[in-house]
Amino acid sequence: MTGPDGEGTGAIWAAAGPAIKTSNSETRSGKRAFISIDSCHYIAVMLKVMIAPVTPFQQNCSIVWDSETMEGTAVDPGGDFDRLKQAIDEQGIKITKVLLTHGHVDHASAAGTMAEHYGVKIEGPHKDDLFLIEGLPESGRKYNFPAYKPFVPDRWLENGDTVSLGNLSFDVVHCPGHTPGHVVFVHKPAQIAFVGDVLFRGSIGRTDFPFGNHEQLLSSIRERLWPFGDGMQFVPGHGQTSTFGWERKTNPYVADLLFDD
């Protein structure tokens, strides 16, 4: 089965990179499980991440929180709201905002419902994705998604903005190409980025959508993401985690050896 972003659906993945583990026994029963990024890897900043592949498209919703204040967010809650809520509440996380990388249905559908439930605002993506946000009800019907609450983000994000979460601060990087308003959230102290569908392990985002632009996507990755350094680990919108350095060496679309500069 192929999702709206062109990524194949499948079973829970054992994520690559340090200190990542499955957090419960659901994998053994064949159900979708959560993936945890253990805070011991980021002991100086106390950032915690739990990755939940949601909907039949297995879109990686990242639940991110400051373990000192327990203030948290969901990055790209594309669906399965009840399941996300249960995990959030079990961890004792206080959701203070919802973050969106872009406006595609598998990333944004449940954002309005989550924001209403927790009484918080939605931040992101960039305003150039407004047409996708406005089209979510129609897109949801096309892919048989539940009828989640329509919304318009409370804060559109620009390149160079920052997003706060408890004592944590994330850089906002506008990375158009997959969609015109796509943004990436980067936490430099923890060396982790939430990249949505800009970059995958061994691949890049599709650009055969309205206003997609392949050359623009390549430029976004090489000019706006690579400068954060090879050690930056990233959580993609689908599939396994990786690092910028690994993709610069091996990715068949953006490896350094493909470019003359």
Please identify what each model-predicted range represents:
Residues 11-17, 32-35:
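Residue-level detector of structural "landmarks"
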Residues 74-75, 96-103, 123-126, 174-177, ...:
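Active-site neighborhood of phospho(di)ester-bond hydrolases with catalytic His/Asp-centered motifs
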Residues 46-91, 184-196:
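Conserved beta-strand hairpin/beta-sheet module of binuclear metal-dependent hydrolase folds
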Residues 138-139, 162, 168-261:
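Metallo-beta-lactamase
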Residues 33-45:
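Short, Lys/Arg-enriched N-terminal segments with co-localized hydrophobic residues
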Residues 1-8:
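N-terminal helix-forming leader/targeting segments
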Residues 79-164, 168, 249-257:
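Active-site HxH/HxHxD metal-binding segment of metal-dependent hydrolases
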Residues 68-69, 79, 105, 129, ...:
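Short, glycine/acidic-enriched loop or turn micro-motifs at the edges of active sites
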